[in-house]
Design a protein with these regions (language model features):
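Short, charged/polar, Gly/Pro-enriched secondary-structure boundary elements
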Residues: 185-188
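Two-component histidine phosphotransfer core
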Residues: 1-171, 176-182
Length: 188
């Protein structure tokens, strides 16, 4: 239930570099990081948080990740709740999926994309769909150990046993990785 420590260190380094050429943007980034850390440190202690609050966390996370992205990476984010704010979700349940997209979906040399869509419906269904470019790591790179996704599976089984569906995989042409997680929150 935590953020990758490398994310925090990279973000601080990016903010440090940003100070030299755009202090206003650096101040914004510090505020976004502060909101993000507040959520991780305090809201994470609860079993469930309002979906809207979790979506705000994801917006802050993506805003911080965009600071370090090369120009050729297109990021689209669509986060909506049509439940009137009543939906509750386990905190940070989606963050490993999103981190994965930023970690494995970006190439420094080839155009890349990340698409993040999360919808909360009045029937209690929350659907998270993440699509990203598939840039397989080399054989020597052990950064893709799968531990993050394994942790997500364990948390889903613990919190939402029998009330979720998670479909993930690589497209036939090998170009796109998709992760589609649907959780039925009202049946708990």
């Amino acid at each position: 239930n935590q953020l990758n420590p490398h994310f925090l260190l990279n973000t601080l380094n990016n903010i440090y570099a940003l100070i030299a050429f755009n202090s206003d943007k650096a101040q914004e980034a510090v505020q976004e990081l502060s909101k993000l850390l507040r959520h991780v440190l305090y809201d994470n202690q609860q079993t469930f948080v309002p979906l809207e609050k979790e979506l705000d966390f994801i917006r802050n996370y993506v805003a911080l990740m965009r600071i370090r992205l090369p120009q050729q990476v297109e990021v689209s984010v669509n986060l909506e709740v049509d439940s009137g704010g009543a939906l509750q979700i386990a905190p940070l349940i989606f963050i490993s999926l999103i981190e994965n997209a930023f970690k494995h979906g970006i190439s420094p040399t080839v155009d890349s994309f990340i698409s993040i869509s999360i919808f909360g419906h009045t029937d209690g269904t929350v659907r998270c769909e993440i699509l990203n470019s598939n840039h397989p790591k080399s054989g020597q790179d052990k950064s893709g150990s799968g531990v993050g996704l394994e942790q997500v599976s364990k948390r889903l089984e613990l919190i939402y046993p029998g009330h979720y569906e998670w479909i993930k995989g690589i497209s036939e042409n090998g170009q796109v990785y998709s992760s589609i997680l649907t959780i039925q929150t009202k049946s708990l």
